[in-house]
Curated annotation (Swiss-Prot):
Binding site for (2R)-3-phosphoglycerate: 98-99, 101, 115, 137-138, 140-141, 196, 228-229
Superkingdom per UniProt: Eukaryota
GO biological process, one term: gluconeogenesis
Binding site for AMP: 276, 280, 299, 371, 402
Residues that hold CDP according to the record: 274, 298, 396, 401
Entry binding sites for ADP: 274, 298, 401
Binding positions (Mg(2+)): 433
Name of the protein in its database record: Phosphoglycerate kinase, chloroplastic
EC numbers for this chain: 2.7.2.3
Pathway recorded for this protein: Carbohydrate biosynthesis; Calvin cycle
Organism name: Nicotiana tabacum (Common tobacco)
Length: 481
């Protein structure tokens, strides 16, 4: 919860580019920091509004002098594979549910092995402790057995990363699988075929889950990207295998997305972007309960602008969410959260990479033009706000970052977060396009945490219970990190 010392709102967008008065805009919250030029949607520049800038400066000074206590990071109270002793692992058959859903090109070559690499620490830990690893995953959304969704193309890279020859079986249940499991040596790894080749997987049918569980002695879930799904291999198997624990990747996701967000070092800022308010309602409302500063970007800002009575040209607007936008602004104000909307935007005459573009105040978007990125003044204001923080979380681009011309805002935020990370600020990048942005800029490695989840990250930030997590064994006692 934001402190009472931050109860006043930040000045909003001027009615016109030459106005001398501003409407008060309630603070709204953002979840993750964008670091690359904002490519997805544009915002109008604040250059025309000195009052906006002055009000922001006043707010930032108040945050710097705030006496709000700095709090540590608490870990999620789930038992982890690291809590198991060597004796509990040696010689044991361990069913590991990983998320190896990597992209493949037309020739079945892996184009991004991030998820495979993310699964390696847990697998290597089990191998080093003499466990027999039975590795399970899905790939894509097959309708029954579909050769192009086979996990076979993953074997060479997995083997290379693990330093052993991974054995691949043509099914995930049945006599052949049982035979190979029985012959698996300590430290060996057997990769099962795509669990989604069976419709029973996504239906979480108990009999299918029981067959999967019968292969092993204990269960490790390291598939954060599917933890929000109650499937047989993510939730059903836990009813038949004990212990059922979190892998290192899943535990890290929980530590950051639950621990660092619920009990952050302060000031705590959230950056939320993306095209639609409707897709981020839950995240924004949840973050308003926790953050001190909320920075909004992406296409959703135009719904907030219109709700304030501003002209938005042909920019994306969710007409049925105008009242919601107003209520979120009011809620931010009531919670004492400093909500910053872009004061200037980069607009275009069409939605295309070669569109004509210009920078205008957010209050001066002409008819026939659409916002596709935040402007330079907004980037500076956002950066100034971020300079006051100790924890930042970012979810969603600032603009249409698929088009280079409108990626500047997103990329600028990515670079700023990298700079802050080097100064000891906790920086959390939450899935999807935000991850793509920091990777494009080349700063992914310096962030405190980059989430591997898309929908799972959003649901966790919204405060929802993830079936794949709640099903795991509780830790012996809450652990403070």
């Amino acid at each position: 919860m934001a402190s009472a010392t931050a109860s006043h709102t930040l000045c909003g967008i001027p009615a016109t580019s030459s106005s001398t008065t501003n409407k008060a805009i309630a603070p709204s919250s953002a979840r993750f920091l964008a670091k690359t030029p904002l490519r997805r949607l544009g915002f109008a520049g604040a250059a025309a509004d000195s009052l906006f800038t002055n009000h922001v400066a006043t707010k930032l000074r108040s945050l710097k002098s705030s006496s709000k206590p700095i709090r540590g990071v608490a870990s999620m109270a789930k038992k982890s594979v690291g809590d198991l002793t060597a004796a509990e692992l040696k010689g044991k058959k361990v069913f590991v549910r990983a998320d190896l859903n990597v992209p493949l090109d037309d020739n079945q070559n892996i184009t991004d092995d991030t998820r495979i690499r993310a699964a390696v620490p847990t697998i290597k830990h089990l191998m080093a402790n003499g466990a027999k690893v039975i590795l399970s995953s899905h790939l894509g959304r097959p309708k029954g057995v579909t050769p192009k969704y086979s996990l076979a193309p993953l074997v060479p890279r997995l083997s290379e990363l693990l330093g052993i020859q991974v054995v691949k079986v043509e099914d995930c249940i049945g006599p052949e699988v049982e035979k190979l499991v029985a012959s698996l040596p300590e430290g060996g790894v057997l990769l099962l075929e795509n669990v989604r080749f069976y419709k029973e997987e996504e239906k979480n049918e108990p009999e299918f889950a029981k067959k999967l569980a019968s292969l092993a002695d204990l269960y490790v879930n390291d598939a954060f990207g599917t933890a929000h799904r109650a499937h047989a291999s993510t939730e059903g198997v836990t009813k038949f295998l004990k212990p059922s624990v979190a892998g290192f990747l899943l535990q890290k996701e929980l530590d950051y997305l639950v621990g660092a967000v619920s009990n952050p070092k302060r000031p705590f800022a959230a950056i939320v972007g993306g095209s639609k308010v409707s897709s981020k309602i839950g995240v924004i409302e949840s973050l308003l309960e926790k953050c001190d500063i909320l920075l909004l970007g992406g296409g959703m800002i135009f719904t907030f602008y219109k709700a304030q009575g501003l002209s938005v040209g042909s920019s994306l607007v969710e007409e049925d969410k105008l009242e919601l936008a107003t209520s979120l602004l009011e809620k931010a104000k009531a919670k004492g959260v400093s909500l910053l909307l872009p004061s200037d935007v980069v607009i275009a005459d069409k939605f295309a990479p070669d569109a004509n573009s210009k920078i205008v105040p957010a209050s001066a978007i002409p008819d026939g033009w659409m916002g596709l990125d935040i402007g330079p003044d907004s980037v500076k204001t956002f950066n100034d706000a971020l300079d006051t923080t100790k924890t930042v979380i970012w979810n969603g681009p600032m603009g249409v970052f698929e088009f280079d011309k409108f990626a500047v805002g997103t990329e600028a935020i990515a670079k700023k977060l990298a700079d802050l990370s080097g100064k000891g600020v906790t920086t959390i990048i939450g899935g999807g396009d935000s991850v793509a942005a920091v990777e494009k800029v080349g700063v992914a490695s310096v962030m405190s945490h980059i989430s591997t989840g898309g929908g799972a990250s959003l649901e966790l930030l919204e405060g929802k219970v993830l079936p794949g997590v709640i099903a795991l064994d509780e830790a012996d006692a809450p652990v403070a990190v």
